[in-house]
Amino acid sequence: MSEELILRTENVCKSFNGIQVLKNVNLEIRKGEIHALMGENGAGKSTIIKIITGVYTKDDGEIYIDGQHVVINNRHDAAEAGISVIYQELSLVPELTVTENIFLGHELMKPGLPDKKEMRRQVQALIDRYGFLLHPDEMVATLGMAQRQMCEILKALSTEAKLLIMDEPTTSLSASETEQLFVTM
């Protein structure tokens, strides 16, 4: 396991309407590690995820990415810091292909037109690199839940994220799909 620290939080706090839901949360994640946040309902798992990914702002504390202090006030700040998130509710468009979904909103362009050939090549390279059972031209509507989750992962990885956060990634998966997802990770 690498000693390279990707994320560090120090004493992160958050309150809603005067009720403290996070108090002095310290977290360290190194390159190549996989972590699970576990706890009872209301323990603050989703809140810390939402702070790290820019959905919520913290009330106090510090966040460091690659040893550098960062201020994350929104999702754009998180993305700029190299943080990608996959929420329980997938954000794929079923009527589009795997490639179209992965590049939706940040298409590669050649003079005046989307560079479909290059986007497809990059998606195939990602599929090959991670060993996912996907085809770049396959319609998302035809994919099973595990394959859709893999498509979301590829979408996040296509941005060259340093840190990938998955919020309850197995909630809607069968036992075999969950196993396939864990093998991939």
Ranges and model annotations:
Residues 2-185:
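Glycine-rich phosphate-binding loops of nucleotide-dependent enzymes
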